[in-house]
Amino acid sequence: MLLRLTRMVVIRALRDEDVPAVSALCLAAYATAGHFDANDAYAASVRDVAGRRGHGDLLIAEEDGVIVGAVMLCSSDSEYAEVSRADEMEFRFLAVDPQRWGQGIGESLVMACEEQAHACGIPAMTICVIDINAAAHRFYERLGYSRLPERDWQPRPGVNLLGFQKALD
């Protein structure tokens, strides 16, 4: 008989001591995905985990004491909210260690956001994804998100963000 041991990923709130590791992880994930080079202005925003504190819930995925993913969950009145409305929440800055892509960590973080929003009585989750990230579009559609074209927007010329939404039943 073959026994298979699997590692357990724990989703928990960000702690002060996590900030440097999460900043590096976010920067690496977004750069590896081709969203910017390390000197891009958006890189500073992605890297600024400390600046996001107090503007939403920062969750991390940890495995065997190593941070392998992170996400920010924010309400519609957060300065970080981009497309959510009063009865919605959204998550931002989803990042997974590039060496761990495809292992369910991103899905676990998204599910944690959805569960937290649902527990607060929020009926829907919204997100926006850059138009050139077809892999992310497929990922979110697989998780039950649908396009919300009326929420598409451009933070700056040439950067097209597509709105997505999921009902939290």
Locations of the language-model features?
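Conserved N-terminal entry element of GNAT/NAT acetyltransferase domains
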Residues: 1-20, 169
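Acetyl-CoA-dependent GNAT
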Residues: 16-99, 110-111, 116, 167-168
